[in-house]
C-alpha cells in the first residue's frame, strides 16, 4: 500500500525552512543547471555555485528524470540537497507531471522532504502540483502483505512526509485531495489484481467491491440462483467447473440528475483462469490470477468517482468467476444460451471472458439503459502480440466515444490504440450449429473476440478495451513498480470528468 506517504502543500516562502535542519530539500534544474528564484533564495548566495560544482564532479547534466544528491549547505533547514533534472526547454514544455512526482518520491524515500516546485520559465499550477502528488503516491505503492521477512531497507520504500511548495498552494491542496481520491482508486485496483486466487475468490471479490457502499455507492450482488432466473447461461457455464460460485456485482453511483441515463463500466472478473478443459500450459499459469484486471479497474474507478463526488451517473458491473476443469466443467462443442437469447457453440473453454461479458452487458442494458458502455477485459494474448505491453487495444462502434477514450488515454498516459472491426471478423465467429462460436480461429484473435462482444451491445455506443498487455506484469514506469498496474482507473476517471460530468 501507499499508506506510508504523507503529502502536504505550502508556500514557496517555506523553501528555506526545515525542522531542525533535518530532511531533504528538493530543487529542480534544466540542462543549463539554472535554479528558480525560490530555490536560489533558499540555498543562499553560494547555492548555484555549489550545485554547479557538484554537477561537474558527478557529471550531472540536468537531463530529464535524473538526480544528484549532496550535503545541503548550512542554513537551509535540511541535511541533504536533492537536485532533480528536468532536461531541455523542449523537455520542460511537455513535462509528465505524474512521472516527475513518482521519480522525485523515489529519490527521497523514507525521509522528510520539502519540494520546491519552482524553476525558470515555469509557474507550476495547482493542477500540475496535483498530478505531481498523484505520481508520488502511486510510486510508493508496494504489495508485500504476505511477506513475513522484510528486507532491512523495507522502511525506505515510502516517503515519511513530502511538502510541495508552490505559489498557489491553497488551490494545490484542493487538487491534492482529488489526487488522493484517484490514487486510492488505482491502489485498490492494484491490490485486487495482486491478491492470490485462494484469497480473492468470487465471493470475497464481491465483498470487497461491496465496501464501496461506505462512499455512497449503491450495491447489488447477484448470486447463482438469480443468474439462473435471468437466463445467464453463458456466464454460469464458465463457472460450473469451479467449487467457487460466481457473483455479479452492480455498483451504482448516482451523482447526476435522477432522469439522466448512466455511463456503464463493465469488467471481466475471472479471478483465476486455468483455461478449463482447454487447459493452459503450466508455464505462466500463475499469472492468471490477474485475469480479473478489468473488473479491478471498474471497482477502482467507482471508488475514485465516489470519493470525489463526481457529478454524473455511473453504473459499474463486474462478472466474477473462476474457470476451472472438473467433471462438471463446460466442454468444447457445448451449446450455451446467453441471457440475450443468442446461442453460442463452445470451441475453446479458454475463451471464457467474452462469455462472462456477454451476459453482464445484456443485464446492464436491460436494467439500466446506459448512454454508453465501456468494457475492460484481459481478453486475448493476441492483443499483446499486436501492441505489446505499453498500450491497450480499443474496439468501438462509435467514433465519438472512441475519440474521447483516446484523448483520455493521451492525457493520463494510459494509452489506447483503436483496432479495426470489420464484417470479416464478425463472419469468422459464425457457427454451423449455433448463432455464433466463442472463437474465430487463430488469426485476428483480438478482433474476433471484440466482434463477439459487439453482438451483445445492441445499438448502445460501446468501446471494448483489451487490457491483457497492460493490466499485469507490464513494463515498469516512474509511477508503477507493481505487478498489478491498476491500469484503466485513471483513464476512466478522466473520460467521465471530461465528457460526462455536469459543468
UniProtKB/Swiss-Prot annotation:
UniProt keyword Iron, yes or no: no
Gene Ontology biological-process annotations: proteolysis
Any one Pfam family match given in the protein's UniProt record, by short name: Peptidase_M17
Enzyme class: hydrolase
Binding sites annotated in the UniProt record for Mn(2+) 2: 268, 273, 291, 352
Essential cofactor(s): Mn(2+)
Reactions catalysed, as given in the entry: Release of an N-terminal amino acid, Xaa-|-Yaa-, in which Xaa is preferably Leu, but may be other amino acids including Pro although not Arg or Lys, and Yaa may be Pro. Amino acid amides and methyl esters are also readily hydrolyzed, but rates on arylamides are exceedingly low; Release of an N-terminal amino acid, preferentially leucine, but not glutamic or aspartic acids
Residue positions binding Mn(2+) 1: 273, 350, 352
GO cellular component, one term: cytoplasm
Similarity field: Belongs to the peptidase M17 family.
Function: Presumably involved in the processing and regular turnover of intracellular proteins. Catalyzes the removal of unsubstituted N-terminal amino acids from various peptides.
Name of this protein: Probable cytosol aminopeptidase
Organism: Methylobacterium radiotolerans (strain ATCC 27329 / DSM 1819 / JCM 2831 / NBRC 15690 / NCIMB 10815 / 0-1)
Name of encoding gene: pepA
Amino acid at each position: 500500500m501507499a499508506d506510508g506517504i504523507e503529502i502536504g502543500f505550502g508556500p514557496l516562502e517555506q523553501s528555506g525552512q526545515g525542522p531542525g535542519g533535518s530532511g531533504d530539500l528538493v530543487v529542480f534544474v534544466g540542462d543549463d543547471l539554472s535554479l528558480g528564484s525560490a530555490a536560489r533564495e533558499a540555498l543562499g548566495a553560494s547555492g548555484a555555485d555549489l550545485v554547479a560544482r557538484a554537477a561537474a564532479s558527478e557529471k550531472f547534466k540536468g537531463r530529464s528524470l535524473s538526480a544528484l544528491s549532496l550535503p545541503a549547505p548550512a542554513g537551509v533547514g535540511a541535511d541533504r540537497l536533492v537536485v532533480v533534472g528536468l532536461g531541455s526547454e523542449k523537455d520542460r514544455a511537455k513535462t509528465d507531471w505524474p512521472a516527475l512526482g513518482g521519480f522525485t518520491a523515489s529519490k527521497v524515500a523514507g525521509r522528510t522532504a520539502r519540494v520546491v516546485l519552482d524553476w525558470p520559465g515555469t509557474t507550476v499550477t495547482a493542477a500540475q502540483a496535483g498530478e505531481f502528488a498523484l505520481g508520488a503516491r502511486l510510486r510508493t505503492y508496494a504489495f508485500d502483505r504476505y511477506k513475513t521477512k522484510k528486507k532491512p531497507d523495507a522502511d525506505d520504500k515510502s516517503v515519511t512526509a513530502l511538502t510541495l511548495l508552490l505559489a498557489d498552494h491553497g488551490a494545490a491542496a484542493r487538487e491534492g485531495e482529488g489526487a488522493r481520491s484517484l490514487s486510492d482508486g488505482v491502489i485498490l485496483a492494484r491490490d485486487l489484481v495482486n491478491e492470490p486466487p485462494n484469497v480473492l475468490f468470487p465471493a470475497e471479490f464481491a465483498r470487497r467491491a461491496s465496501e464501496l457502499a461506505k462512499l455512497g455507492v449503491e450495491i447489488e450482488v447477484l448470486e447463482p440462483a438469480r443468474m439462473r432466473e435471468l437466463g445467464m447461461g453463458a456466464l454460469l457455464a464458465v463457472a460450473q467447473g469451479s467449487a467457487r460460485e460466481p457473483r455479479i456485482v452492480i455498483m451504482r453511483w448516482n451523482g447526476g440528475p435522477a432522469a439522466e441515463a448512466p455511463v456503464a463500466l463493465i469488467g471481466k472478473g475471472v479471478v483465476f483462469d486455468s483455461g478449463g478443459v482447454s487447459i493452459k500450459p503450466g508455464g505462466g499459469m500463475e499469472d492468471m490470477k490477474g485475469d480479473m484486471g478489468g473488473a479491478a479497474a471498474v471497482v477502482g474507478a467507482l471508488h475514485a468517482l465516489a470519493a470525489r463526488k463526481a457529478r454524473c451517473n455511473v453504473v459499474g458491473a463486474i462478472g466474477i468467476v473462476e474457470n476451472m476443469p472438473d467433471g462438471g466443467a463446460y466442454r468444447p462443442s457445448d451449446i450455451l444460451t446467453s441471457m440475450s437469447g443468442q446461442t453460442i457453440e463452445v470451441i475453446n473453454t479458454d475463451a471464457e471472458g467474452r462469455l462472462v461479458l456477454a451476459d453482464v452487458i445484456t443485464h446492464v442494458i436491460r436494467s439500466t439503459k446506459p448512454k454508453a458502455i465501456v468494457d475492460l477485459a484481459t481478453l486475448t494474448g493476441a492483443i499483446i502480440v499486436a501492441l505489446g505491453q505499453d498500450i491497450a487495444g480499443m474496439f468501438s462502434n462509435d467514433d465519438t466515444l472512441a475519440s474521447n477514450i483516446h484523448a483520455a488515454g493521451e492525457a493520463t498516459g494510459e494509452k489506447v490504440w483503436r483496432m479495426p472491426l470489420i464484417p470479416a471478423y464478425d463472419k469468422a465467429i459464425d457457427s454451423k450449429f449455433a448463432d455464433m462460436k466463442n472463437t474465430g480461429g487463430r488469426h485476428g484473435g483480438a478482433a474476433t473476440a471484440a466482434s463477439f462482444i459487439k453482438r451483445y451491445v445492441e445499438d448502445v455506443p460501446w468501446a471494448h478495451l483489451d487490457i491483457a498487455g497492460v493490466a499485469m506484469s507490464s513494463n515498469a514506469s516512474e509511477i508503477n513498480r507493481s505487478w498489478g498496474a491498476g491500469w484503466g482507473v485513471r483513464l476512466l476517471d478522466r473520460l467521465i470528468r471530461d465528457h460526462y460530468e455536469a459543468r
